[in-house]
Design a protein with these regions (language model features):
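Hinge/lid segment of periplasmic solute-binding proteins
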Residues: 78-93
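N-terminal secretory/targeting leader peptides
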Residues: 1-72, 90-307
């Protein structure tokens, strides 16, 4: 609606449900080939095509440098991230114009059947994790990490195929129904501190647009970033209250040894990928240079204001 209004109706979108034309994991291919003009997905889905996609969609452990979703957007808008993001598609050999539109993080560590006091407790459970580097990092610290699609998680928990799981954050987790099978919820995690969803448009379609239409897409995308962050903070807060006060979910603190073990493994994984891929290294170096300047202020200025 925003784009249609900004362009006076010259650009209109027909919104189709996921899977109507192709599966979610085929979205980028479909846009690239012009099967559909545009699509919506999470850029870390394409980490198998290029490891640097993870750094834009969901940089593990905040890129190993203390970046949260707000700091990530600062890097993206003003620290050189957007220019590197635009190059990603060429690195992947795709005829794509991408727009980052929906920050989602931070995601919760997850749901457990019993409290976990330390990593020894954590290692007792078969744990659903995201695919790719975040999930592999769990395996690197001895967690029985199991990747599976969202629709398979609750049946797997009920069948005992897995014991514990992560999905997203309070609002989506409540809607999903985790509280029906597990009651111990841990918010603080490192696997997906930053998560971003994107809008993709095929290059041929984008290049045929007027300058006004292109600028309208940019303005709408930037507005969406702010609206998404604002929406999720409040909605997740309401959902967390419902989980604890209505559904009897117990909010737990993540064991301290989790952070040291996961961060060390994440940094090792990032270093390995940087050694193997020059563009990955360039993007990560940019993040680290940004964090060296921004994180001391941003993390240092945070405080808990509770009466």
């Amino acid at each position: 609606d925003t784009v249609t209004a900004l362009t006076g109706g010259s650009l209109k979108f027909e919104i189709m449900p996921a899977g109507a034309v192709v599966g979610v994991k085929e979205t980028l291919d479909a846009v690239d080939k012009g099967l559909i003009d545009c699509g919506f997905a999470w850029t870390h889905y394409w980490s198998g095509d290029h490891p640097a996609a993870m750094l834009f969609g969901s940089p593990v452990a905040g890129g190993g440098v203390g970046i949260d979703n707000i700091a990530f957007l600062s890097w993206f808008q003003y620290g050189g991230g957007k220019e590197l993001y635009d190059r990603l598609w060429k690195e992947m050999g795709r005829d794509i114009k991408g727009f980052m539109i929906q920050p989602v993080g931070p995601e919760a560590l997850g749901w457990f059947p019993k409290p976990i006091k330390d990593m020894a407790d954590f290692r007792k459970y078969k744990f659903r994790t995201p695919p790719g580097i975040p999930g592999q990092t769990y395996k690197d610290i001895g967690i029985a990490s199991v990747a599976m699609g969202g629709g398979d998680i609750l049946p797997a928990l009920e069948a005992g195929t897995i014991d514990a799981a992560e999905w997203c954050c309070p609002k989506p987790d409540l809607t999903f129904g985790f509280q029906k099978v597990l009651k111990h919820y841990y918010l603080q995690g490192l696997h997906q501190v930053v998560v971003n969803a994107d809008f993709y448009i095929t290059g041929k379609t984008y290049n045929a647009m007027s300058d006004h239409e292109k600028k309208s897409l940019e303005v709408a995308a930037n507005a969406s970033l702010a609206k998404s962050l604002s929406y999720r903070i409040y909605e997740n807060g309401k959902a967390l209250r419902e989980l604890t006060e209505v559904h009897g979910v117990k909010l737990e603190d993540t064991p301290s040894d989790y952070f040291t073990e996961y961060m060390a493994a994440a940094k090792k994984s990032l270093e390995t990928n940087a050694a193997k891929n020059a563009f990955f290294a360039e993007v990560w170096d940019s993040m680290k240079a940004f964090a060296d300047i921004a994180v001391p202020f941003w993390s240092g200025a945070q405080c808990l204001m509770r009466s």
